[in-house]
């Protein structure tokens, strides 16, 4: 959506396809850093996103005795050399809703229920075969799209990357994590991010824009039991004391594992990749969505100029030259 808006604003008409029937209601991504806020400001969507967000004043990191001895480390927000120094907490579905509205207002086309089956390219363009599902065609109807360029911003399991046969080298982390979105009223500041490095594992507590909280805990490697709130309750008591209030049933409860991977090439002739199709990493630091937003913003103006006959392949090559080192640094940082 960032790429689509930027292309439409630059006079480069585009069409987006997504095999999902619509936006997902849940998402792990929710942190927006200063650079993403600057990009959204340039795109004309920042104020709408801010209205859906909670601004964090600080990041607190506590040791193995929880809040008993106070934070080991506090990072005050507001000191970055940016017009938007605060970290914003805004769940990805809300961000996507704002971006989709902006994209459509600019005349952009978005096809839901449209799955990419195959893609071929030659010196003059790209031909994509898409399976379009609808109420009239439950089994789907094949459609063929001819385009000058194609960008795969289709996530960690990118069909575009797979079709190109590009290596996605890296490894899996051994730990697994539980994530819960809960109604909770702890004795914690609701304008700060809280991380607890506890003796038996970690706890992250993030206040959400709607007064709920997001909790994340580490699990023992190989845990396969159905996830529940028991481990969250243990970590909360360890972090905040035996008298701390405990959340009841979660709105959303999920287990996830983490990979660290980076694609070998961001471009193969007229087909390019962006975001999680290029790089996946630990969610610590909220880098994934932000790096993908910056990928798209960097790429968009290059595509517009290329389609107008400027820069040629050298201009498209500059995308990988500029963005892949950023991903390499980011992966080292979150490790």
Regions flagged by a language model, labelled:
Residues 138-149, 153, 268:
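Core beta-strand elements of the Rossmann-like FAD/NAD(P) dinucleotide-binding domain
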Residues 112-127, 254:
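A conserved short coil-to-beta-strand element within the FAD-binding core of flavoproteins
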Residues 69-70, 139-144, 202:
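Short, mixed charged/polar active-site loops
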Residues 50, 109-111, 169, 251:
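General small-molecule cofactor/ligand-binding pocket signal
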Residues 20:
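Residues in the short beta-alpha loop(s) of Rossmann-like NAD(P)-binding domains
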Residues 1-11, 17, 99, 152, ...:
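Conserved mid-domain beta->alpha element of the FAD-binding
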Residues 25-106, 117-120, 208:
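Active-site-adjacent segment of FAD-dependent monooxygenases/related oxidoreductases
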Residues 101, 134, 149, 153-258:
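Conserved FAD-binding catalytic core of PHBH/FMO-like flavoproteins
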């Amino acid at each position: 959506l960032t790429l689509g808006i930027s292309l439409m604003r630059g006079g480069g008409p585009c069409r987006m396809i997504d095999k999902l029937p619509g936006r997902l209601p849940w998402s792990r991504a929710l942190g927006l850093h200063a650079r993403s806020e600057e990009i959204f400001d340039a795109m004309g969507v920042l104020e709408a996103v801010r209205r859906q967000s909670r601004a964090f004043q600080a990041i607190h990191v506590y040791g193995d005795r929880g809040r008993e001895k106070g934070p080991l480390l506090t990072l005050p927000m507001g000191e970055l050399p940016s017009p938007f120094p605060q970290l914003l907490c805004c769940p990805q579905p809300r961000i996507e809703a704002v971006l989709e509205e902006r994209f459509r207002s600019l005349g952009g086309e978005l096809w839901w229920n449209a799955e990419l089956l195959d893609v071929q390219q030659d010196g003059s363009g790209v031909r994509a075969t898409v399976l379009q599902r609808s109420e009239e065609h439950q089994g789907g109807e094949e459609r063929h799209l001819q385009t000058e360029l194609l960008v795969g911003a289709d996530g960690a399991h990118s069909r575009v990357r797979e079709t190109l046969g590009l290596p996605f080298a890296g490894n899996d982390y051994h730990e697994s994590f539980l994530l819960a979105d809960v109604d909770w009223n702890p004795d914690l500041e609701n304008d700060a991010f809280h991380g607890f490095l506890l003796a038996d594992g970690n706890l992250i507590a993030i206040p959400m824009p709607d007064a709920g909280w997001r909790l994340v805990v580490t699990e023992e490697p190989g845990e396969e039991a159905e996830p529940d709130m028991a481990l969250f309750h243990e970590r909360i008591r360890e972090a905040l004391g035996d008298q701390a209030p405990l959340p009841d049933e979660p709105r959303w409860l999920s287990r996830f594992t983490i990979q660290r991977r980076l694609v070998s090439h961001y471009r193969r002739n007229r087909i390019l990749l962006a975001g999680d199709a290029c790089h996946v990493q630990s969610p610590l630091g909220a880098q994934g969505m932000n790096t993908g937003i910056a990928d798209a913003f960097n790429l968009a103006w290059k595509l517009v100029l290329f389609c107008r006959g400027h820069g040629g392949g050298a201009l498209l090559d500059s995308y990988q030259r500029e963005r892949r080192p950023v991903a390499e640094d980011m992966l080292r940082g979150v490790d």
